[in-house]
């Protein structure tokens, strides 16, 4: 499945919630009719079956993190193999992706922009360039912006936006040096309550 390259707002309208795919700290404005389906008039959303609700939640989370279907399924399989709660393991794996960590640290205004920084070799982990967006960052790893990329206006703009967002407690960031430490894996209480990972587990458990 190819990565979606169309309007970001359309995805948020399809899911009926702000997926935070666009830069900025404000939620998408109500005039954008976030609860209305895509299209000129917004087709009325049919009542979903239990399966439909589970599928919708999976699609929402997959789009938030910008992960393709096969990748997402593999994350679920790995989460199921790990000890502990499968749903929480899944979210921890998604949060541990390098592109997501770069976004959380404020070096990219969106996860898509953070992914681009990684693929363009602008990001280092423990002093070594890593250009794989799905690379799993481990506790105590140091993630930094390469020296030649620190002058990029988009990185500076992203850091300014990040100052207005709530800072993740599992990360420690030095905005001046453009580097941060992944102190620990996030706990479930650290993450959005708007995600219902139990629905995803139910979907894949069938």
Swiss-Prot record:
S4 RNA-binding domain location is 96-156
GO BP of this protein: ribosomal small subunit biogenesis; translation
Q: Is ATP-binding found in the keyword set? A: no
Under the heading SMART domains, the entry gives: Ribosomal_S4 (SM01390), S4 (SM00363)
Record keywords, A-Z: Ribonucleoprotein, Ribosomal protein, RNA-binding, rRNA-binding
Task: Please indicate if the UniProt record lists rRNA-binding as a keyword.
Answer: yes
Q: Which domain of life is it from?
A: Bacteria
What GO cellular component is one of the record's annotations?
small ribosomal subunit
The GO terms this record gives for MF are: rRNA binding; structural constituent of ribosome
Q: Matching InterPro entries, A to Z? A: Ribosomal_uS4 (IPR022801), Ribosomal_uS4_bac-type (IPR005709), Ribosomal_uS4_CS (IPR018079), Ribosomal_uS4_N (IPR001912), S4_RNA-bd (IPR002942), S4_RNA-bd_sf (IPR036986)
Function noted in UniProt: One of the primary rRNA binding proteins, it binds directly to 16S rRNA where it nucleates assembly of the body of the 30S subunit. With S5 and S12 plays an important role in translational accuracy.
The similarity annotation says: Belongs to the universal ribosomal protein uS4 family.
The entry describes its oligomerization and partners as: Part of the 30S ribosomal subunit. Contacts protein S5. The interaction surface between S4 and S5 is involved in control of translational fidelity.
Q: What is this protein called?
A: Small ribosomal subunit protein uS4
Source organism per entry reads: Cronobacter sakazakii (strain ATCC BAA-894)
């Amino acid at each position: 499945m190819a990565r979606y390259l169309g309007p970001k707002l359309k995805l948020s309208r399809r899911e009926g919630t702000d997926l935070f795919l666009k830069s900025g700290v404000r939620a998408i404005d109500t005039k954008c009719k976030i609860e209305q389906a895509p299209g000129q008039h917004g087709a009325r959303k049919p009542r979903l079956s239990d399966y439909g609700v589970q599928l919708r939640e999976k699609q929402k989370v997959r789009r938030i993190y910008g992960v393709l279907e096969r990748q997402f399924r593999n994350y679920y399989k790995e989460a199921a193999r790990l000890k502990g709660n499968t749903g929480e393991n899944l979210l921890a794996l998604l949060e541990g992706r390098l592109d997501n960590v770069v976004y959380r640290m404020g070096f990219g205004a969106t996860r898509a922009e953070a992914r681009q920084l990684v693929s363009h070799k602008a990001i280092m982990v423990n002093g070594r360039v890593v250009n794989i967006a799905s690379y799993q960052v481990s506790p105590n790893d140091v993630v930094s912006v390469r020296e030649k990329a620190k002058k990029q206006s988009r990185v500076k703009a992203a850091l300014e936006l990040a100052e207005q967002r709530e800072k993740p407690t599992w990360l420690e960031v030095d905005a001046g040096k453009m580097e941060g430490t992944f102190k620990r894996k996030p706990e479930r209480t650290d993450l959005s309550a708007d995600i219902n990972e139990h629905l995803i587990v139910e979907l894949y458990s069938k």
